Structures are given as C-alpha cells and as structure tokens.
C-alpha cells in the first residue's frame, strides 16, 4: 500500500484554494488587504494611518506611503524591547534576521503567529499539494524529509524576543506531529556551529530512509558532499535510494544545477523551487 496516496488526499482542499487564487488573484488580494487593515486598526501603526476608515485599496494607497525598513525600524526596535500592539495586534516575540541589501546591515523582521500559520506553513503545504498533483505516484511519506535550516538565539538586547534565520523559526515552531516525519532532530537542526551541525546531521541521517530534501541549495550541497564523503558513495541515491524531491529556496538553484547533477544522478529526482523569504511566502513552482 502506498501511504502517500492516502495522506496526499488531505491536501485536496488546498488544491481547490490554490486554483481559486490562481484565477481570482486580484479579488483575493483586495479581501486580504481589508482583513489585515481591520485586524491592525487598533495598533499604534493602524491608528496613525486611521486604518479603521480604510474601505478599499485606493484609500490604503493614498493614506499609507511606501516606506523603507529604516523608516519603520524604530517600531521594530521597540518590539524587540518588549512593547506590543505597535504594528500588529498579536504578541511578537520572534524576529527573522534578514541580510540587508541597502546598507549592508541585517534587518530584523517581526514574525507573528499568524505569519507562521497563514503564510509560511501554508506555503509549505501548498508546495506539497502541488507536488502530489504533478506526481501522483509519489512515495513521499514512505520515508522522512531532511530539512536543513539555520539557527536562532536570544536577542542580545532584550529578554523579550528571539532572533534567528527564518528556517530556524519555522523548525522551532512547527507542529510537533511534523517531527515524526522529518530529520534531523530539533536539537541538531538548531545547532549554531555550522561544521558541528553538518557533521551531526550527516551522522544521524545516513541510516534513515530519506525521501525528500528541503533547504537552501548552497547549504544542502555542503551536506550532500559530507554524506558522500562519509559513506564513500558516488551519488546520493546510493545512500538514500528512495529520495525523490528537493524543495529548494533562499537563493537561485541555477548556479548549482551542474553540481547537483554530479551528486544526484538519478533521472527520477525532482526539483521544486519555492520563493520563501523572511518577509513572506511568495510562490511555488507549478510544473
């Protein structure tokens, strides 16, 4: 029995939603904007721009100017210090550390529980749903998914918040049930020292039936090369014969394609690009 065929049926409702927003993107965006302005109306930011009187996109466009990170940074710093209800009504304790592109300094982006559930985790579910639609004979759930992420740490300036790579925040807050189908353990996954982490992941996952990979192409390549080095194998499918898909994001995979062809030689391997950033989950490959 292919258990993946059974479990993948639970993703059918998401496929209907995906088809809907693919055909009605504009209308859905307007509804989302209305919902967000209503929810944030009583925050300090919402009161500043009178969110409660915004009725449509035109109102929002005229009322709220485009702003840089530096302009909202004072709000972010106050959130990091423990203040709440500034930009969003629910408690903010997590901050995704994003590399700056304008002033070479890291940006700290607030991550709410709604952002985790309604954006990042939902985006991951959508990526899986689309993959199962395109590959109905998948054996994805016959093994475990190897997820390679970053790390997090307490905010050095405050006891009220935690800072880390988005991938680490996702691993830290994921539904505990997911831990039964993913490797490595959370303790190993969130290690901060890179070389020690790669070694620990390789040692703990080599004996496992890994069917999928998720992570940044450049990071994953380092791990794959370490696994091959430790096992003496020439190709990753010799270590994990049921490996079938790599969900990759963070950076473009194109510069690494040739290297991946050398370490994963089976033509059955699938590559699914996801556009997930600290700011949100923006898209998933659909072919």
Residue ranges and their predicted role:
Residues 1-287:
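Active-site phosphate/ATP/adenylate-binding loop shared across adenylate-forming ligases
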